Design a protein with these regions (language model features):
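Hydrophobic residues in well-ordered beta-strands that form the structural core
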Residues: 107, 128, 177, 319-321
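Conserved core of the PLP fold type I
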Residues: 51-167, 183-199, 205, 344
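Helix C-cap/helix->beta junction micro-motif
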Residues: 122, 170-171, 200, 284, ...
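N-terminal small-domain helix-loop-helix segment of the aminotransferase-like
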Residues: 2-88, 95, 256-257
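PLP-dependent enzyme catalytic core of the Aspartate aminotransferase-like
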Residues: 77, 200, 303, 314-320, ...
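Conserved glycine-rich beta-strand-loop-beta hairpin in the small C-terminal domain of fold type I
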Residues: 250, 254, 270-278, 288-300, ...
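Conserved core segment of the aminotransferase class I/II
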Residues: 198, 202-271
Length: 352
């Protein structure tokens, strides 16, 4: 199997440059949370440490009850629905084409690299497509959409989502919406694919994660929800493969979803950091595109992205080249908001 190079390995020389800055490295390249996980999650994990038996692939009864309340209240109030907890969202993204035996997968032309990798692992053809679904190939098995999108933070509108659903129904294509940044709307509040499905989840799936909104990337806690027939197909394969969320993590996930106030607390932290970084990058001559939701600024100096990466590294700041996400990102860089308040302040000072 021939896979692309792991993108972040290519940043090593620039990390070395940035690390040599007299005041040290400020890493804004990877969207990994730095704030503490909620105490409710930590307590639930600690009190569930004794787990001698095998957990259920579908999730235990208390987690399932919580997940259904969460999904119904936020995304899909009526209509047939099923869901599964997953071991983070990345493994689900990487394995889903295999689990549903997809032969042709459509991904956004600027996209999270794991969409492509998942198609390659499945032996499927992978086609990058633009925004207009009327121009998409009609013979695909699976199409990934991402709203809010990583890396550029674009939010798909209600009309765009409805058009995609209509296209999918006409072409009998499965649509999976990666909504892992759903709770982090800034200039525009995101909509879930299921929110505009009029109670019909057939052929539709959504993926959500606790990693960013609850500072829980280390827990590997996420879920997939939607069409009961598709969830049943995915569940059966996952049962055979032993892809099961550990019982203590199920307990922590349930505790988090039962305490949604934590989302607002963390969102406010990111809002402040975003304002500081946005002003600093604009002041340094960058333009910022989209970035209306999510954990990143999609920025450009009007030059090839590796030049910008080196420019930032000379100032002790490590950011991500847009080319990692597709050829269309070649003149942009992605700036993560996931640094401490102090590091965000220091980065802004270096850009001044």
């Amino acid at each position: 199997m021939r896979l692309p190079d792991f993108p972040w390995d290519l940043l090593a020389p620039y990390k070395k440059i940035a690390s040599s800055h007299r005041d040290g490295l400020i890493d804004l390249s990877i969207g990994t949370p730095v704030d503490d996980s909620p105490l409710t999650m930590q307590s639930a994990l600690a009190s569930s440490g004794s787990a001698p038996g095998y957990p259920l692939t579908i999730g235990n009864a208390t987690l399932r009850a919580t997940l259904e309340r969460w999904i119904r209240s936020k995304f899909f109030t009526v209509g047939p629905l099923d869901f599964l907890p997953t071991i983070g969202s990345k493994e689900l993204v990487g394995l889903l084409p295999t689990l549903i035996q997809a032969k042709k997968v459509l991904i956004p032309e600027i996209a999270y690299p794991t969409y492509q990798v998942g198609a390659l692992v499945a032996g499927a053809e992978c086609v990058a497509v633009g925004d207009d679904c009327r121009e998409w190939p009609k013979d695909a098995d699976l199409v990934w959409i991402n709203t809010p999108a990583n890396p550029h933070g674009r939010v798909l509108s209600q009309s765009q989502l409805r058009e995609i659903i209509s296209w999918a129904r006409d072409t009998k294509t499965i649509v999976v919406s990666d909504e892992c940044y759903f709770e982090l709307g800034w200039d525009r509040e995101p909509l879930s694919l299921l929110q505009v499905a009029d109670g019909d989840s057939a052929g539709l799936l959504i993926v959500h994660s606790l990693s960013k909104s609850f500072n829980a990337a280390g827990y590997r806690a996420a879920f997939i929800a939607g069409d009961p027939a598709l969830i049943a197909q995915i569940r059966e394969v996952r049962k055979h493969l032993g892809l099961i969320m550990p019982a203590p993590i199920q307990a922590a996930m349930r505790a988090a979803l039962d305490d949604p106030a934590e989302i607002a607390i963390q969102k406010e932290r990111y809002r402040v950091r975003r304002e500081v970084l946005r002003a600093a990058f604009l002041g340094a001559g960058f333009t910022i595109s989209h970035s209306e939701a999510g954990l990143y600024l999609w920025a450009s100096r009007g030059e090839e992205c590796w030049q910008t990466i080196e420019w930032a590294a000379q100032r002790g700041i490590l950011i991500t080249p847009g080319i990692f996400y597709g050829e269309k990102g070649a003149n942009h860089v992605r700036v993560a908001l996931t640094a401490t308040d102090e590091d965000i302040r220091r980065a802004a000072e270096r850009l001044a």
